[in-house]
Every structure is written in structure tokens, then in C-alpha cells.
């Protein structure tokens, strides 16, 4: 069975595992999913990410991060641009998530980057998701 929106599936798996206080979640791999997971790691939302090669498409293993008393680091994660309704933003109108406390993940000509990087490089693109 084919999946309509694999990025939404990635975000939903992370959101559900986070809400259930799981330590690890495994997700079917793709290039854009790897990029999104690496951004979440570099921004400190997840502890680690590793790619496991199988003889099909591979698996991304995401290690979730929790604070003191098992408080969630990821408070919210939301898909913005969907297959049925794409959302684009120019470099000067990129969104700020929670006044800069969260990040927007943007797919640009320079690759998949955060809103802060896109502003510094002066590139716009498709607004994939918000994470806070």
C-alpha cells in the first residue's frame, strides 16, 4: 500500500512516541525524512538519529529526548504544507514559530533547512513543518 504523505507519517510517529514517552521510534527511510531527522537532532529536539540499512528502503531510528522528570522536549510538531495544499514562503516572509522559540522546517533550493538558516541565506521555499 502506498502512503499519501510520508512526511506527515514521520511527524505523527515522532509525536505519538513522544506522547507515550517511548525512547526510540523506527520510521521507513527516505532522503527528505533523513534531512528532517538531522535538523531535529541539530536543533536539540531529539537525542540521536541513526540510519539502518536493510535490503529495501532502510529504516531511520530516532532516539527521543526528555528533560528532567521525563518532561517532553518536543511540545508540539505540526505539518504545514500538505500534498493537497502546498504552502510556500519567500525569504522575507518566513514564519517565526512561537516568536523564535520553535523552528520551521523549510525545503529550499539549498536543501532542507530551518527558518533561521533560510533567513540568513535569503532563500524561501516550501514550509514543511513547525516544531516547538
From Swiss-Prot:
GO biological processes: translation
A cellular-component GO term for this protein: ribosome
UniProt keywords, alphabetically: Ribonucleoprotein, Ribosomal protein, RNA-binding, rRNA-binding
SUPFAM superfamilies in alphabetical order: Ribosomal protein S8
Ribonucleoprotein is among the record's keywords: yes
InterPro entries referenced in this protein's UniProt entry, alphabetically: Ribosomal_uS8 (IPR000630), Ribosomal_uS8_CS (IPR047863), Ribosomal_uS8_sf (IPR035987)
Gene3D superfamilies with a match to the protein in the record: 3.30.1370.30, 3.30.1490.10
MF terms in GO: rRNA binding; structural constituent of ribosome
Domain of life: Bacteria
Keyword Cell cycle set for record: no
PANTHER family for the chain: 40S RIBOSOMAL PROTEIN S15A
Function field: One of the primary rRNA binding proteins, it binds directly to 16S rRNA central domain where it helps coordinate assembly of the platform of the 30S subunit.
Assembly description: Part of the 30S ribosomal subunit. Contacts proteins S5 and S12.
Family in the record: Belongs to the universal ribosomal protein uS8 family.
Official protein name in the record: Small ribosomal subunit protein uS8
Gene from which this protein is expressed: rpsH
Amino acid at each position: 500500500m502506498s502512503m499519501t504523505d510520508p512526511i506527515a507519517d514521520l511527524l505523527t510517529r515522532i509525536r505519538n512516541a513522544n506522547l507515550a514517552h517511548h525512547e526510540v521510534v523506527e520510521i521507513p527511510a527516505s532522503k527528505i525524512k533523513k534531512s528532517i531527522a538531522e535538523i531535529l537532532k541539530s536543533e536539540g529536539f531529539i537525542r540521536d538519529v541513526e540510519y539502518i540499512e536493510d535490503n529495501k528502503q532502510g529504516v531511520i531510528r530516532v532516539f527521543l529526548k526528555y528533560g528532567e522528570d521525563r518532561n517532553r522536549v518536543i511540545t508540539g510538531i505540526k505539518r504545514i504544507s500538505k500534498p493537497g495544499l502546498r504552502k510556500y514562503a519567500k525569504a522575507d516572509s518566513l514564519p517565526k514559530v512561537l516568536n523564535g522559540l520553535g523552528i520551521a522546517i523549510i525545503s529550499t533550493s539549498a536543501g532542507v533547512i530551518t527558518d533561521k538558516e533560510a533567513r540568513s541565506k535569503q532563500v524561501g521555499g516550501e514550509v514543511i513543518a513547525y516544531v516547538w
